[in-house]
């Protein structure tokens, strides 16, 4: 006992922690705590709140996915408290206790810090009391000797409390099905006016009367003198109060206890407490002694524990098993106060006043009336104002870079190729490619030409226009107008995320709302130059910089911040710094960061050159004496950054760790663009100080290093002075290595910083420093001379950079902006990881693994499969477990999927080879956009298996916990444990019917929860016999406790009342009618009695009855070849044997609460589907036990109701997949999955089923499957996604970037210069004038060229072939161009080829090219060709091009192909037919000699030609002709002059081939008076040897009418012979008959306006200029049919021999439009011939013969095709507008086009309301 003087100094003190919140606004209290925690005076409060949140985040992360995924993000207590208790997630008890602990201990700590008082509670005079959860707060204080210890102990007590709440809530949900969301039902009521004894007596009687099983009893949880609290499941409490008049009429109130039971000794045991304490992972030392005593709320005396672990155990035990006696608490407190007789006062700390606290005060005052009570309210301080806040230090977490991707110059299209470029010391510098801009016109080294570049050099990435638009849900038009920087930013962002294994939402740190993007961009070349040539719909979202990051966030659905940053040359590094800052500030948990730069605008070259930034001699010469400026470069880079602790928790591969970052500005520089050494040093020192790193620890600095005299000198000074000072000097082992990536790839400007960072990351990864190649002559003399003394310098060859043993490498990356900004990043090695393994033989103990590959397109899927196979071939030692983890858990899964289950790498390789060889990608069906329905099927007793193998139980703690929890319920209900049965015990008791049936139900309920953990949630349930009980639990009709009680009691009653094996059951493969027919016709069984117990399928019937009868039936059926299988069960359920069971079962069930199902129940008792809460009741269970199992009827009803379909996945949740076997028979196309299977490992079965679900579109939560052992797996760096790319590129045409400089002189440029006048690199002929794109890969080549028909040689060639006094291009011109391009590209790919033999195939020309008579105008054409060497095939398409804008038309006017073939095959073919051709020639000559055939002279021949075409002298190669009807032979002599640069001059080709045209337009067998004949093209043109100048040839042809065309079309083969040997053939040249009256219409010269502005002859006034695109080629747009009358069917080409008539690009018109299309008809058929030259203004109406899609609906679809640049074949009925890239902007464009062109008014929302093509077509058909 204390001395009286000590009592005066230290009066008795009580700290009381109740179980109620203060009456204040709790959210406001939390807000106040949060505000104060930001003040430096409340550091411990801040620490406690942060520690508490970390504990809760950690605990939430451990919850099952279906719960944690719905927990809103929280990063502080205010965020969490404002979301409430989350009762609908089953977290009410856990969250309520957490809030109370955080509030109480936060207020306690803050109360002390507010007055700067340390914790000083004398042990002898202080005691701590708590009520219920408040005991954990009391424990935290009792275990702490200081406030700092309260922080740690409080957080860990919070952990135990939260876990206890989760456990109690989870366990309680098994006692009674959860209430519907939003409804609260109390689990406790307080009763006043009755004694504890009378209440207990009444409860004992009521529990017995209601038949409440042990787990559902109503019991006393708390008591005092005036009240008693009773607890139990809400429905049981309600029933008890209704059953007992004493309770019903007592004064009672429900308590706010909504989340389960505590204080229940009959439910919980010490095992439950031990489970909570084991999984809580408390950090409080188990042996920590008490500081203060804690009074028990049950006994009123201090707990007897002596250590921390014992105290927490006793508190937890009291909470779950101990009854609260308030009187004992009060007596214990009064006893403590009275222990100090000399005391004049006592101090009591509490949180406001409650009823219980008032009782404590009254008791003290009564027993000690002379004692002064000093009340200290721990809440008051929080409302005080403490003046100006003193800010805490910001967070300094280390950050982890976990993913990267890039496109760099020099062909470095991924990070591996980038490293190869660096390691090999390659220089990526080149001249500006022609697809960027034309150097010949835009480069002037003298600087005299305004706006011209003064240097031709740069560093450029490959294929900047190539993009997978469909993957990113963009239409071709949107993709084309979108800046390539935007496109490649999102591509590299995806690739970096893929490398990082970042699956959005996989973990707490990867939630969508916690990911942001930060990119640097400093130019808008595409918007300012390329796209501005024809500003389209997507000019703003496709070109404005902010959309670069906006597009990333939008596509990935990230709602975190997105910032586009422009700090000139340091933009990307500033963006990385911004991302790091956001992570340090807690704004995001994951940051995508990077930079972009694509160069297309010569203006920036001019500007930088005029400012003397650029080197006139080439690459950046960093630290070279001749450094003369930087060399521009392109680059795209992305990285993924996370906090280090998150990356480690998420099992990420960490490339490097960011220690700190800083940015400042050279404010003291001599000019804004001049660097300043002092500020650079400041920035470097700042990052070192923030990280606590010595400069001597830094072993590498990646310099900004631009290769300028000033920049290199100043940066070298700043770097060396900071990191390699003269005092103290670096030790010999502390070499400082330096380097600069710009010496390899130039200055990427906005992408420079990210290029340097990725190089740095690669160095960490490769453990090497690549050589510096910047010094081309000698070291810059301005640099420090003492590098040796400083132990610093460059590396000139690849040098090992190894991680020191037990230490980390530290490096610095510098990036400076021309505007004066400096950004510095400090990095270190990733933490070392040590591989864990379950066993030496296996990573995770599993024998089979799921491997998944997916894509969004079939081409990409095939590519991804090939890439994976290639990876395995390069890495044969790949760990299959890691590969499975990577492809399943760490990949985003797309709609096209291939997956398999394998046990070895070799088996996987075999599967992949087979898939690739069979081209499986073409047959894979896309998974449905809507998740298919999933039905859980629960098998009955027939599937019982002795022991479910232990893999699931051992490997999945969540499954094990569920089984053990359910087993505890089983034992509490008085039944034996089922765990031995599940583990395969053969003990007699284990094999009893009670245990057998309970083990099945426990297994099935646990499996249902396990599947839910894996993300598979049922849409409906169906149970077979016993399995229906488990189905009812999953559907929420019955609680788990009630189900187990009913099943156990039913089994007990059956055992008691029925004779085992007196009856039996028999499964028969026959219908009931077949069985009855066989049984009744056999005398031995004609009178036996049996029942149909189960109708499983139409031909699978289970019979039941007396054992002897069933055995007799079996013998009869087997003799008639019916398959029979006796069921090994002791009782015959669903037969008369159950008659003695059902009455008692129904009585027991009457005391059970039944609820409406939360999901449909396919009732096998009723053969229907149950939705309501009335149908399933005690009577239902009675009938279910006795009646027939109507499995077939239940399934068929569900199908009729639309609940299931062919896409439904059926998951069997039993010991063996019996029920899904029935489903397979009822619906063979159904997908089925099993949970367990006899004679197969559980994990193998589960893995196969997961793959089945995955392929069906019910994507599992793969991460949960790997989660129990996640740390043993490694994320593999697999090949990146195989993109299905198309080139979307708008070339800059003309010289208007230069021309605008003339305006200030009053000179107005007249149009753009003709492409023909622009010299270009590469191929150049008389018809090919400028190369706009040339890409050469190993096996493919692409060439885009521009030509001008008005160029002299081209114009002359066209005018050599005039029709109707117009120069019309002959198809020989297109043939020559095809041959020229074909040989050019082929030799690029096969330079060693001696000869190139080409077959020009499938030439088709839709629109004749009529040359304008206006002098000085331009008529540009575009030709696009792509050669595939594997296919030996090249495709070609010709387009009209807008002379003003340079944009090509969206549709081609001509197309062809070139096949590269073996000429030996030609010779063999022609040798077989040569004698026949020579025979016909000889016959014609004889007929001419006999006067039967006509011999025609050269002059007469070309006079006949003039009926249609007038050839110039060049083309007149025919010397004479013999003609007989449609057959002719001609002697030909080619003129010697080539008249230009050609592959094969067109006038030579025409001379040897146009005999066919002479027959059709000059033969007396042809009606040339009314018609002329034009050719749509030919099938093939082959020449064995080049045509020779002046050489003599023979041409022979016979034309035949095509029967399908009814005389309107003729075709023939033109044979070309030299010296009576066939040397060439023009196969199947076709001619179509056209009424002569249409000659003027088709062949009128274009107007000056049309030719000079639109660049296409006769463009109609209503037609918009053609859209520029280099997207995938499209089929030509069909034109409006005109009434039948005079025009041949399908005519499209106008050329007496090789000339094509043109179609208009006008769309069909409505009756209310002024501009129409004139037409004529032919008696045979309708036609679509129109002319682009036609400007007729008469309206016509389309014919009624058009098919469904050529009316208004078809016109709408064509507009959609045209405006999106999508091929018509892509517009299938099921194609969604979202997939096609039709966004809100495109919707507006389409609705406007519909209105303007078709006269129909539709809202743009139509494409949202009708999301597919088919729905839009139907809507238009019905409403327009």
From Swiss-Prot:
Residues 1329-1467 are annotated as: N-terminal hotdog fold. Residues 396-829 form the Ketosynthase family 3 (KS3) domain. Residues 1649-1690, 1702-1750 are annotated as: Disordered. It comes from the Eukaryota. Residues 1747-1824 form the Carrier domain. Residues 1492-1640 are annotated as: C-terminal hotdog fold. Pathway: Secondary metabolite biosynthesis; terpenoid biosynthesis. The modification O-(pantetheine 4'-phosphoryl)serine is found at residue 1784. GO terms for molecular function: 3-oxoacyl-[acyl-carrier-protein] synthase activity; fatty acid synthase activity; phosphopantetheine binding. Residues 1329-1640 form the PKS/mFAS DH domain. Residues 1325-1644 are annotated as: Product template (PT) domain. The keyword Transport does not apply. Multidomain protein; including a starter unit:ACP transacylase (SAT) that selects the starter unit; a ketosynthase (KS) that catalyzes repeated decarboxylative condensation to elongate the polyketide backbone; a malonyl-CoA:ACP transacylase (MAT) that selects and transfers the extender unit malonyl-CoA; a product template (PT) domain that controls the immediate cyclization regioselectivity of the reactive polyketide backbone; and an acyl-carrier protein (ACP) that serves as the tether of the growing and completed polyketide via its phosphopantetheinyl arm. This is Non-reducing polyketide synthase vrtA. It comes from Penicillium aethiopicum.
């Amino acid at each position: 006992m204390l001395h009286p003087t000590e009592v005066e100094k230290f009066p008795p003190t009580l700290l009381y922690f109740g179980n109620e919140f203060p009456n204040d606004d709790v959210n406001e209290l939390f807000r106040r705590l949060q505000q104060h925690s930001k003040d430096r005076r409340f550091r411990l409060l801040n620490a406690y709140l942060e520690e508490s949140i970390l504990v809760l985040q950690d605990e939430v992360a451990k919850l099952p996915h279906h719960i944690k995924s719905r927990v809103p993000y929280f990063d502080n207590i205010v965020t969490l408290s404002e979301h409430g208790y989350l009762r609908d997630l089953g977290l009410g008890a856990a969250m309520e206790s957490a809030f109370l602990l955080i509030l109480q201990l936060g207020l306690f700590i803050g109360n002390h810090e507010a007055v700067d008082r340390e914790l000083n509670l004398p042990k002898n005079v202080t005691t701590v009391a708590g009520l219920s959860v408040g005991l954990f707060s009391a424990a935290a204080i009792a275990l702490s000797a200081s406030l700092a210890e309260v922080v740690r102990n409080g957080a860990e007590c919070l952990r135990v409390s939260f876990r206890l709440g989760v456990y109690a809530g989870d366990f309680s949900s098994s006692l009674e099905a959860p209430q519907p969301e939003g409804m609260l039902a109390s689990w406790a009521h307080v009763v006043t006016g009755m004694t504890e004894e009378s209440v207990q007596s009444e409860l004992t009687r009521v529990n017995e009367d209601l038949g409440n099983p042990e787990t559902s009893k109503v019991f006393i949880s708390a008591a005092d003198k005036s009240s008693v609290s009773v607890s139990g499941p809400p429905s049981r409490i309600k029933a008890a109060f209704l059953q007992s008049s004493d309770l019903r009429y007592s004064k009672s109130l429900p308590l706010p206890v909504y989340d389960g039971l505590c204080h229940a000794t009959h439910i919980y045991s010490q095992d439950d407490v031990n489970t909570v304490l084991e999984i809580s992972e408390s950090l409080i030392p188990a042996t920590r002694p008490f500081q203060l005593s804690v009074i028990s709320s049950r006994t009123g005396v201090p707990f007897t524990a002596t250590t921390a672990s014992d105290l927490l155990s006793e508190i937890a035990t009291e909470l779950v098993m101990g009854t609260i006696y308030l009187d004992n608490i009060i007596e214990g407190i009064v006893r403590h106060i009275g222990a100090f007789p000399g005391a004049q006062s006592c101090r009591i700390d509490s949180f406001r006043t409650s009823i219980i606290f008032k009782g404590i005060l009254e008791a003290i005052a009564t027993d000690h009336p002379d004692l002064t009570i000093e009340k200290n309210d721990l809440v008051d301080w929080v409302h005080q104002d403490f003046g100006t806040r003193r800010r805490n230090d910001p967070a300094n977490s280390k950050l982890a870079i976990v993913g990267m991707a890039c496109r760099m110059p020099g062909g470095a299209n991924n990070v591996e190729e980038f490293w190869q470029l660096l390691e090999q010391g390659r220089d990526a510098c080149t001249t500006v490619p022609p697809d960027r801009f034309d150097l010949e016109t835009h480069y002037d080294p003298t600087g005299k030409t305004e706006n011209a570049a003064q240097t031709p050099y740069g560093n450029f990435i490959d294929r900047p226009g190539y993009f997978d638009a469909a993957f990113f849900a963009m239409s071709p038009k949107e993709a084309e107008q979108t800046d390539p920087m935007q496109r490649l930013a999102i591509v590299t962002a995806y690739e970096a995320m893929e490398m990082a294994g970042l699956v959005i939402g996989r973990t707490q740190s990867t939630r969508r709302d916690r990911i942001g993007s930060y990119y640097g961009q400093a130019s808008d070349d595409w918007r300012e130059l390329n796209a501005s040539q024809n500003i389209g719909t997507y000019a703003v979202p496709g070109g404005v910089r902010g959309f670069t990051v906006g597009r990333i966030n939008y596509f990935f659905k990230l709602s975190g911040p997105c910032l586009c940053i422009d700090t000139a040359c340091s933009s990307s590094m500033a963006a990385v710094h911004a991302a790091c800052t956001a992570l340090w500030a807690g704004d995001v948990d994951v940051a995508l960061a990077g930079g972009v730069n694509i160069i297309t605008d010569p203006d920036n070259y001019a500007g930088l050159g005029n400012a003397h930034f650029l080197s006139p001699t080439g690459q950046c010469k960093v630290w070279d004496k001749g450094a003369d400026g930087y060399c521009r470069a392109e680059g795209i880079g992305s990285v993924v950054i996370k906090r280090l602790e998150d990356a480690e928790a998420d099992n990420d591969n960490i490339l490097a760790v960011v220690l700190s970052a800083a940015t400042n500005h050279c404010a003291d520089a001599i000019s804004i663009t001049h660097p300043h050494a002092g500020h650079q040093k400041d920035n470097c020192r700042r990052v070192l100080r923030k990280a606590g790193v010595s400069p001597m620890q830094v072993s590498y600095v990646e310099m900004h290093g631009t290769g300028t005299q000033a920049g290199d000198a100043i940066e070298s000074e700043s770097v060396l002075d900071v990191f390699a000072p003269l005092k103290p000097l670096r030790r010999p082992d502390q070499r400082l290595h330096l380097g600069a990536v710009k010496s390899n790839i130039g200055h990427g400007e906005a992408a420079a910083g990210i290029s340097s960072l990725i190089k740095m990351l690669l160095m960490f990864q490769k453990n090497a420093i690549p050589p510096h190649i910047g010094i081309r002559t000698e070291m810059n003399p301005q640099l420090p001379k003492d590098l040796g003394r400083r132990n610093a310098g460059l590396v000139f060859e690849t040098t090992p950079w190894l991680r020191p043993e037990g230490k980390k490498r530290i490096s610095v990356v510098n990036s400076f902006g021309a505007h004066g900004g400096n950004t510095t990043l400090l990095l270190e090695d990733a933490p070392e990881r040590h591989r864990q393994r379950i066993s030496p033989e296996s990573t995770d103990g599993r024998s089979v693994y799921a491997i998944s590959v997916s894509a969004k397109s079939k081409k990409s899927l095939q590519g991804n499969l090939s890439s994976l196979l290639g990876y395995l071939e390069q890495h044969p030692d790949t760990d299959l477990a890691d590969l499975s983890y990577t492809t399943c858990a760490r990949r985003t899964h797309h709609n096209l999927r291939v997956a398999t289950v394998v046990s070895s790498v070799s088996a996987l390789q075999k599967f992949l080879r087979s898939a690739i060889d069979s081209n499986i990608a073409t047959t894979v069906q896309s998974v449905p956009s809507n998740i298919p329905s999933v039905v859980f099927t629960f098998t009955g007793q027939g599937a019982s298996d002795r022991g479910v193998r232990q893999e699931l139980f051992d490997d999945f703690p969540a499954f094990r916990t569920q089984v053990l929890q359910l087993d505890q319920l089983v034992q509490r209900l008085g039944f034996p444990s089922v765990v031995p049965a599940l583990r395969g015990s053969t003990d007699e008791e284990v094999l009893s019917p009670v245990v057998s049936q309970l083990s099945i139900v426990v297994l099935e309920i646990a499996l249902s929860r396990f599947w839910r953990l894996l993300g598979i949630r049922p849409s409906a349930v169906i149970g077979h016999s016993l399995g229906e009980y488990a189905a009812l639990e999953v559907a929420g009709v019955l609680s788990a406790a009630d189900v187990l009680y009913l099943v156990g009691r039913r089994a007990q009653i059956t055992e008691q009342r029925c004779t085992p094996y007196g009856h039996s059951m028999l499964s028969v493969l026959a219908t009931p009618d077949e069985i009855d027919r066989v049984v009744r016709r056999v005398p031995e069984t004609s009178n036996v009695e049996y029942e149909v117990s189960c109708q499983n399928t139409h031909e699978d019937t289970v019979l039941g009855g007396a054992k002897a009868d069933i055995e007799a039936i079996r013998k009869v059926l087997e003799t008639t070849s019916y398959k029979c299988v006796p069921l090994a069960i002791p009782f015959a359920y669903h037969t008369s044997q159950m008659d003695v069971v059902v009455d008692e079962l129904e009585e027991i069930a009457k005391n059970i609460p039944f609820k409406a199902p939360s999901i449909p129940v396919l009732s096998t008792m009723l053969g229907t589907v149950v939705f309501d809460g009335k149908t399933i009741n005690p009577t239902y269970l009675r009938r279910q036990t006795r009646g027939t199992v109507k499995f077939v009827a239940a399934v068929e009803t569900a199908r009729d109701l639309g609940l299931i379909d062919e896409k439904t996945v059926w998951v069997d949740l039993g010991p063996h997949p019996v029920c899904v076997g029935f489903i397979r028979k009822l619906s063979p196309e159904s997908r089925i999955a099993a949970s367990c299977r006899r004679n197969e490992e559980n994990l193998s079965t589960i893995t196969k089923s997961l793959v089945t679900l995955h392929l069906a579109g019910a994507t599992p939560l793969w991460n949960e499957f790997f989660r129990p052992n996640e740390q043993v797996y490694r994320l593999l760096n697999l090949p990146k996604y195989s993109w299905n790319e198309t080139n979307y590129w708008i070339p800059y045409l003309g010289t208007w970037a230069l021309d605008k400089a003339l305006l200030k002189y009053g000179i107005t440029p007249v149009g753009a210069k003709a492409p023909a006048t622009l010299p270009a690199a590469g191929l150049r002929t008389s018809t090919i004038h400028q190369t706009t794109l040339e890409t050469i890969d190993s096996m493919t080549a692409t060439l885009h060229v521009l030509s001008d028909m008005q160029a002299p040689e081209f114009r002359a060639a066209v005018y050599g072939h005039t029709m109707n006094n117009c120069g019309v291009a002959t198809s020989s011109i297109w043939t020559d161009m095809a041959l020229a391009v074909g040989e050019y590209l082929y030799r690029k790919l096969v330079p060693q080829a001696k000869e190139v033999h080409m077959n020009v195939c499938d030439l088709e020309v839709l629109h004749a090219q009529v040359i304008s008579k206006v002098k000085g105008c331009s008529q540009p054409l575009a030709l696009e060709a792509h050669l595939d060497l594997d296919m030996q095939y090249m495709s070609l398409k010709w387009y009209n091009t807008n002379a003003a804008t340079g944009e090509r038309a969206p549709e081609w006017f001509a197309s062809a192909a070139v096949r590269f073939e073996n000429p030996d095959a030609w010779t063999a073919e022609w040798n077989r037919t040569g004698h026949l051709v020579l025979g016909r020639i000889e016959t014609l000559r004889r007929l001419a000699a006999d006067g039967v055939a006509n011999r025609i002279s050269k002059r007469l021949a070309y006079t006949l030609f003039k009926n249609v075409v007038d050839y110039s002298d060049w083309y007149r190669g025919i010397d004479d002709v013999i003609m007989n009807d449609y057959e002719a032979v001609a002697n030909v002599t080619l003129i010697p002059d080539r008249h230009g640069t050609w592959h094969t001059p067109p006038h030579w080709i025409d001379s040897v081939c146009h005999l066919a045209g002479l027959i059709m337009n000059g033969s007396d067998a042809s009606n040339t008076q009314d018609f002329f004949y034009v050719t749509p093209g030919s099938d093939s043109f082959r020449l064995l040897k080049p045509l020779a100048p002046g050489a003599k040839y023979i041409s022979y042809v016979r034309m035949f009418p095509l029967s399908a065309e009814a005389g309107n079309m003729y075709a023939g083969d033109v044979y070309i012979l030299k010296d009576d040997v066939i040397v060439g053939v023009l196969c199947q040249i076709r001619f179509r008959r056209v009424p002569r009256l249409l000659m003027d219409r088709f062949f009128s010269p274009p107007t000056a306006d049309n030719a000079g502005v639109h660049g296409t002859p006769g463009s109609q006034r209503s037609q918009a200029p053609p859209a520029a695109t280099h997207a995938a080629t499209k089929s030509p747009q069909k034109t409006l049919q005109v009434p039948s009358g005079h025009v041949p069917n399908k005519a499209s080409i106008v050329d007496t021999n090789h000339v094509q008539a043109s179609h208009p690009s006008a769309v069909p018109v409505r009756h209310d439009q002024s501009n129409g299309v004139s037409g004529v008809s032919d008696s045979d058929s309708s036609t679509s011939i129109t002319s682009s030259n036609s400007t007729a203004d008469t309206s016509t109406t389309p014919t009624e013969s058009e098919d469904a899609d050529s009316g208004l609906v078809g016109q709408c679809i064509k507009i959609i095709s045209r405006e999106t640049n999508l091929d018509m074949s892509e517009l299938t009925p099921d194609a969604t507008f979202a997939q096609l890239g039709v966004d809100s902007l495109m919707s507006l464009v389409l609705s406007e086009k519909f209105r303007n062109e078709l006269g129909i008014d539709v809202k743009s929302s139509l494409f949202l309301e009708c999301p597919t093509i088919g729905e839009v077509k139907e809507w238009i058909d019905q409403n327009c």
